[in-house]
């Protein structure tokens, strides 16, 4: 079930929420058909004739019932909450992106999990972000750069088979 409202304003403003089964990651088990819910808001607009922007915030709360691990036979039971912020800025000469355009976008997220994994208390905090820019300099030709980073502080599972290294990952691409 999704409910959203697009405000009748001179700029873009949408707010909404969803009730979900919660059968897929980061949730699991569908919690009797009501395992997850979201809230979101997006705002955006034009900056002159060639540039537009949009930013948003979102929140996802899930009840996790028996989510399996990828690396062991244990399962997680508890709560998983995810907060996110995203933005995008687009530029195209005179608003026409066919020949040339540039897009800069990024996102930040933070996830907090509390519960029980394989009979032991578990608390996991993960956060990550990415920033990327893509420039199309000619029809069919573009180049870009992306940097992303992920940090996981999974108290209770660090140095176990679930998280053997206490990960802090990054990538350039």
PLM regions with names:
Residues 1-64:
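Aromatic- and glycine-enriched pocket-lining scaffold segments that form the walls
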């Amino acid at each position: 079930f999704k409910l959203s409202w697009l405000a009748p304003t001179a700029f873009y403003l949408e707010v909404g929420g969803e009730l979900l089964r919660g059968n897929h990651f980061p949730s699991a088990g569908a919690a009797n058909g009501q395992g997850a819910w979201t809230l979101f808001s997006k705002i955006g607009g034009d900056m002159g004739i060639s540039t537009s922007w949009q930013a948003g915030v979102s929140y996802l709360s899930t009840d996790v019932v028996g989510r399996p691990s990828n690396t062991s036979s244990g399962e997680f039971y508890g709560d998983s909450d995810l907060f996110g912020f995203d933005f995008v800025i687009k530029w195209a000469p005179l608003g026409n992106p066919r020949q040339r355009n540039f897009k800069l976008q990024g996102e930040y997220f933070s996830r907090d999990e509390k519960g029980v994994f394989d009979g032991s208390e578990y608390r996991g905090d993960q956060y990550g972000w990415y920033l990327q820019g893509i420039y199309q300099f000619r029809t069919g030709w573009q180049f870009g750069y992306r940097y992303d980073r992920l940090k996981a502080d999974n108290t209770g599972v660090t140095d176990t088979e679930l998280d053997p290294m206490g990960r802090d990952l990054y990538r350039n691409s």
